[in-house]
Amino acid sequence: MPISATARPTIPPTVWATRGRYVGERAEETLRSSLSTLKDAGDIDDFLELPADDTKPDLVFESRTRVGDGVTVRARLSLAPATGKGRDWLLVAEAERPRDRSWPSPVTMFWPAEPDAGGSHDPASGLRPGEICPLPEDDKAVRRLLRDCARDPWYIHVVVHEAMTTDERGRVPLAHWLPLGLRDRVVEHRATPQQYRVTNWALRDVDVKVPRGGAAVLPGRPAPEGYEPDAFAVRAVFLDGTEPVDLVDAVSRYDALPRELPQEAAEALTALREDWHLLTLAEELERERALVAMYAEALDAMTKSRDLYREAAERAHEALEAYREAGTVTPSPL
């Protein structure tokens, strides 16, 4: 199949990319305090706030940690200026090897983990990942919300229909059963028994149908290659406090699909790779050696160019002398 010239790259297996919104006050102070606490506790190795840039309004923070058996993860978070809805942020992180879902989310390398910290909200819906989010009571609001969430390229949106009113056992969030690396990426929408029709009516444009008493993973936009609505619909989710194995599997399979790298994330990833400041001593030495090698190569090239130029000039001079000695008249340049 031919590849479109406009096709965007997919997210590399070593990379996380997400965005969020801070809805509280004093976002900068919260972020700085959280980073200091994380470093003091040994949860991150180090962090750095980059100097303000007059040409860019965002504040930029870098954080580095080790996960698993010592795999280094570098992360970059940019915090946008405040708006009436809060302060949006964009995070990209890259590990030394393909990411593992059992590793903590890079969001925890910056923001406090407390539910009331205000750091992690989905800008598209205003909802907080990792919690149960009931659908609005108003039908039009349901349609608007699900329409927007079905096209969200950043988060994984899951709609669960309650076959009957649940008790406390049924109010365990899906995130409770998910690997650490997915808990900050999944937004769980809950539809009441009476909202079965309006839920599916709202999703008809993306060809998704939530089974009665079941669940569905929404496609996002663009839908990842390999996504088929039926393959990511779960026929029955028992909200009785037991692990929803089939739904966890559907979310994990969706997360494994190759997804397009959003333009904003691509730019942030380039900055992470090419303009990283939070270096270890070994990394600083390596960078200095690379700079010395680069300068040496440039000097060598200049020297060779100079020598070639001098050699060519000498040959031209010799040829001119030979013409003169042979009595050849040199043509006028005019």
List each language-model region with its residue ranges.
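Extended, charge-rich intrinsically disordered regulatory tails
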Residues: 329, 333-334
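Long, contiguous hydrophobic alpha-helical segments, chiefly transmembrane helices and signal peptides
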Residues: 31, 61, 73-77, 89-93, ...
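Heptad-repeat coiled-coil/leucine-zipper oligomerization helices
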Residues: 264-308, 312, 316-319, 326
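Acidic, Ser/Thr/Pro-rich intrinsically disordered low-complexity regions
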Residues: 116-286
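N-terminal, leucine/charged-rich tether regions that mediate assembly and partner docking
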Residues: 1-190
